[in-house]
Amino acid sequence: MAPGRGVLLLICLCLMDNVSQVVCSQNSTTPSKFPTFYSYDCNADTYAPQLTSFSTIWTLLNVLVMTIACVIYLIYMCFNKFVATMTNT
């Protein structure tokens, strides 16, 4: 048996020893805070997103980071093109 195979087997045995089963005490899920969100009457025109929710803040932060990254990249590319054009003439 290869030396690495024994270590892998030992790790697998340790992980399999700690496997347990989780038993739920309730059979139902908690009710939604917004029960009309999944109804057919709710669409983009009638559903108002909350600007203070975590997902909205996270999305706006991602948009800001991507915008800054694109601006930095475009400035870098334009500067390199400008320098290359100036040195060729």
From Swiss-Prot:
Cleaved signal peptide residues: 1-24
UniProt keyword Membrane, yes or no: yes
Keyword Nuclease among UniProt keywords: no
Lineage: superkingdom: Viruses
Cellular location(s): Virion membrane; Host membrane; Host Golgi apparatus, Host trans-Golgi network
An annotated GO cellular component: virion membrane
Protein family per UniProt: Belongs to the herpesviridae glycoprotein N family.
Protein's name according to its UniProt entry: Envelope glycoprotein N
Originating species: Equine herpesvirus 2 (strain 86/87)
